[in-house]
Amino acid sequence: MTVTIEIAVDIPCPAWTEAMPDAEARCGRLAAIALGAVDLPDGVVELSIVLADDATVQGLNRDWRGKDQPTNVLSFASLDDEDAPVVPGAPLLLGDVILAFETCAAEAHDQGKTLADHFSHLVVHGVLHLLGYDHMDDEEAAEMEALETTLLAALGIDDPYGEQ
């Protein structure tokens, strides 16, 4: 058997495609690259990526994390380490990654990066969260950042943490 990756991309905020006409295709490529960094079980693996605006992300951040402010990317993992598909052969539902346009665009500008490069980093970052990576302590952060940097370097994108 093999792994089939299904990525649903929803773009309710048209500013994304105005700024990056290839945003939808880019999401698919980036998610596949991040998913390729881990051993996935045979079968179908599904996730969604939503390219939203700040207001949408602020509402989600407030409702789910208790933080009433927008953020660049949110990840909502569907599974924890003990979860498995309920029905044998059912798709493995990883979860959702949601990005906020205004925050991402402002960060890219402030950091002297292209929106495409910053977007690439945040999609990879969000998908890695769905796979169980986190940055709650220094050790976890170092592992996650090293993997992000490696994956992005393969795309010709500079280390997003290099100037921090």
Curated annotation (Swiss-Prot):
Co-factor binding details: Binds 1 zinc ion.
One BP term from GO: rRNA processing
Major localization class: cytoplasm
Keywords of this entry: Cytoplasm, Endonuclease, Hydrolase, Metal-binding, Nuclease, Ribosome biogenesis, rRNA processing, Zinc
Compartments where located: Cytoplasm
MF-aspect GO terms: metalloendopeptidase activity; RNA endonuclease activity; zinc ion binding
Cofactor: Zn(2+)
Enzyme class: hydrolase
InterPro entries: MetalPrtase_cat_dom_sf_prd, YbeY, YbeY_CS
Superkingdom per UniProt: Bacteria
Cellular-component GO terms for this entry: cytoplasm
Binding-site positions, Zn(2+): H125, H129, H135
Entry keyword annotation includes Metal-binding: yes
Enzyme Commission designation: 3.1.-.-
PANTHER family: ENDORIBONUCLEASE YBEY, CHLOROPLASTIC (PTHR46986:SF1)
Function: Single strand-specific metallo-endoribonuclease involved in late-stage 70S ribosome quality control and in maturation of the 3' terminus of the 16S rRNA.
Similarity remark: Belongs to the endoribonuclease YbeY family.
Protein name per the record: Endoribonuclease YbeY
Organism of provenance: Paramagnetospirillum magneticum (strain ATCC 700264 / AMB-1) (Magnetospirillum magneticum)
